[in-house]
């Protein structure tokens, strides 16, 4: 019987899942919209919703709790400075998951996960030092 099994394993160890959700949530906070597989998007949504609720609280303990989950201090700064105040009057439902067809190659169902009142200017910004290093080598 499948009682009490609340989350998907996604074919990963628990440490890999935790790291993956930390990285994906940092990317989502940075770009405010990312494309991933549908099961990952559905599992990421409650993770990020809880982070936004922490940001709405705004105290030091909430910030430290968010850093322990995301592990990217710069993105936690944006979470508390931009996203927390943006959603201060909204009671949950900060994230939307839209189905985006199927991936070529393995036919995996894809999804776009984004913030509800996102800033369109954030889309397509650099993805950090990795992208800058790739351009420097070329």
Swiss-Prot record:
Signal peptide residue numbers: none
Biological process according to GO: translation
Similarity comment: family membership: Belongs to the bacterial ribosomal protein bL17 family.
GO cellular component terms given for this protein: cytosolic large ribosomal subunit
Self-association and partners: Part of the 50S ribosomal subunit. Contacts protein L32.
InterPro entries tied to this protein: Ribosomal_bL17 (IPR000456), Ribosomal_bL17_CS (IPR047859), Ribosomal_bL17_sf (IPR036373)
Designated name of the protein: Large ribosomal subunit protein bL17
UniProt feature coiled coil, ranges: none
Highest taxon above the source species: Bacteria
Keywords: Ribonucleoprotein, Ribosomal protein
Entry annotated with the keyword Ribosomal protein: yes
Native source species: Phenylobacterium zucineum (strain HLK1)
A single MF term (Gene Ontology): structural constituent of ribosome
Keyword Amino-acid biosynthesis recorded: no
